[in-house]
Amino acid sequence: MPTISQLVRKGREKLLTKKKAPALKESPQKRGVCTRVYTTTPKKPNSALRKVARVRLTNGFEVTSYIPGVGHNLQEHSVVLIRGGRVKDLPGVRYHIVRGTLDAVGVQGRKQGRSKYGAKRPS
């Protein structure tokens, strides 16, 4: 237990919380260019081929981000918008690509939960 004079001299040190999406630099989204588009397998109890892309952001960071939805048109040099949000069964994937913006087209034939996949309202 510190004395009052010790607290006057030093003060308490603030506990710093770790950022969940450091590459965004406090922004809600960031733009970037795909450097590699590939599939990867998830952690132990799950089995699939998850679509991910390595993205070089406008602030110089290079991050791995998940491509949500069924089917995509992304390839190398595609310009995408990324948001925060990790994928629990893919280690190191802490970002999602926003569908329906820039070069990432929305999911075709999507009827429910359309806003998350950039799908237009079916007429």
UniProtKB/Swiss-Prot annotation:
UniProtKB keywords: Methylation, Ribonucleoprotein, Ribosomal protein, RNA-binding, rRNA-binding, tRNA-binding
3-methylthioaspartic acid PTM sites in chain numbering: D89
Domain of life here? Bacteria
What the protein does comes down to: With S4 and S5 plays an important role in translational accuracy. Interacts with and stabilizes bases of the 16S rRNA that are involved in tRNA selection in the A site and with the mRNA backbone. Located at the interface of the 30S and 50S subunits, it traverses the body of the 30S subunit contacting proteins on the other side and probably holding the rRNA structure together. The combined cluster of proteins S8, S12 and S17 appears to hold together the shoulder and platform of the 30S subunit.
Transmembrane helix recorded as keyword: no
One Gene Ontology BP term is: translation
Q: How does it assemble?
A: Part of the 30S ribosomal subunit. Contacts proteins S8 and S17. May interact with IF1 in the 30S initiation complex.
Q: Does the record carry Ubl conjugation as a key word?
A: no
| NCBIfam families tied to this protein | rpsL_bact
What's this protein's name?
Small ribosomal subunit protein uS12
Which is an annotated GO molecular function term of this record? Answer: structural constituent of ribosome
InterPro entries per the UniProt record, alphabetical: NA-bd_OB-fold (IPR012340), Ribosomal_uS12 (IPR006032), Ribosomal_uS12_bac (IPR005679)
Q: Name one GO cellular component term.
A: small ribosomal subunit
Originating organism: Anaeromyxobacter sp. (strain Fw109-5)
Q: Which family does it belong to?
A: Belongs to the universal ribosomal protein uS12 family.
